[in-house]
């Protein structure tokens, strides 16, 4: 978690940890993280917190951990999106894969029995069909990293039937 010194972020992280979905790696202001963990009554090895002095350093350290396979995915804590993305897209130390960059937002609905995710709610403003395919591949990779062998995917558009005047429906049909 980049810049993990945020109460809501840590609540979500440790709910996921309690459900055995993740093993958190906390990066950021160690004093603030420690204080929040105590307030939340969470047990965590405080010596494993990676202390950084700035949001920029938190973002860079997070990317370094991904590149060295010491972490599997990034969760944004209390830092500006621009600071995190600067580290992610850095030409020398970033996370370039050859595919488009997209994000995945997870939704926990108390009355529903499954974890739901929505991918790319706005990073790619007008993706073409090939870019949409890459966005889906990114989301599938995230789910596989979380232990889901065959995630179920639905491609959404404004209407359910293919309409040649609506390129999104044509792309959805192809995907």
Give the predicted meaning of each segment:
Residues 1-175:
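Anion-binding alpha/beta catalytic cores of soluble intermediary-metabolism enzymes, centered on
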């Amino acid at each position: 978690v980049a810049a993990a010194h945020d109460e809501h972020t840590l609540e979500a992280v440790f709910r996921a940890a309690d459900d055995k979905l993740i093993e958190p790696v906390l990066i950021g202001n160690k004093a603030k993280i420690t204080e929040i963990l105590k307030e939340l009554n969470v047990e965590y090895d405080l010596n494993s917190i990676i202390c950084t002095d700035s949001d920029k350093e938190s973002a860079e350290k997070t990317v370094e951990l991904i590149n060295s396979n010491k972490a599997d995915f990034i969760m944004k804590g209390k830092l500006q999106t621009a600071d995190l993305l600067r580290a992610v897209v850095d030409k020398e130390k970033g996370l370039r894969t050859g595919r488009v960059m997209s994000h995945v937002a997870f939704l926990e609905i108390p009355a529903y029995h499954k974890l739901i995710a929505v991918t790319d709610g706005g990073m790619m403003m007008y993706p073409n069909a090939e870019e949409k395919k890459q966005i889906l591949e990114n989301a599938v990779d995230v789910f596989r990293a979380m232990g889901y062998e065959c995630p179920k995917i639905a491609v959404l558009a404004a209407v359910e039937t293919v309409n040649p005047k609506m390129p999104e429906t044509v792309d959805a049909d192809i995907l």
